Amino acid sequence: NEQLGEITFNLDVHGRHVTDRLPVVELKGLIASVDYSRYRYENITLDGEYKQGGFNGKVALDDPNGSIYLNGDVNVSSRIPTFNFQAIINKLRPHDLNLTSKYPDTEFSLKLRANFTGGSVDEMIGEINVDSLEFMSPEKQYFMNNMNIRASKQNNENQLRLTSEFLTASVEGKFQYHTLPAS
């Protein structure tokens, strides 16, 4: 990856590999810094296990331009990818982290709980819950207490429910989720 640069870390790594199977690797320790996309991310703590193509455990980033704490299980290598995790994002500044060229001097915070399956947005089955979403920029400030998105499939029809303090919506039928914003 051209965007990946120097990495400084102190990790305990224990692994095993059996022929014709994905390796099992336990990781615990600190990535002091990693250069990615012309930015040096600092203080990344890992405590988890890479198994069968997925990661189960905790990842924490404590960077001057935001903190992220993830705890749970993500497996994108299984036949049907699975996501079951919690995340806390605090004062993240995506422009300063070189994640986007847009939104200078903007930061956001939120708590997220996700439990869903699917390899794309159109295959999603499950639930995402966002709490305490806070967005701050020089021009705007926004706060939302809670938003819940639930996607299911019944009788070969998609069902999507969105619930928040300012909107409750439900869509059912034969559609693809990615086409909804343009509708």
Place the predicted regions along the sequence by residue.
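Interface amphipathic segments
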Residues: 1-113, 117-183
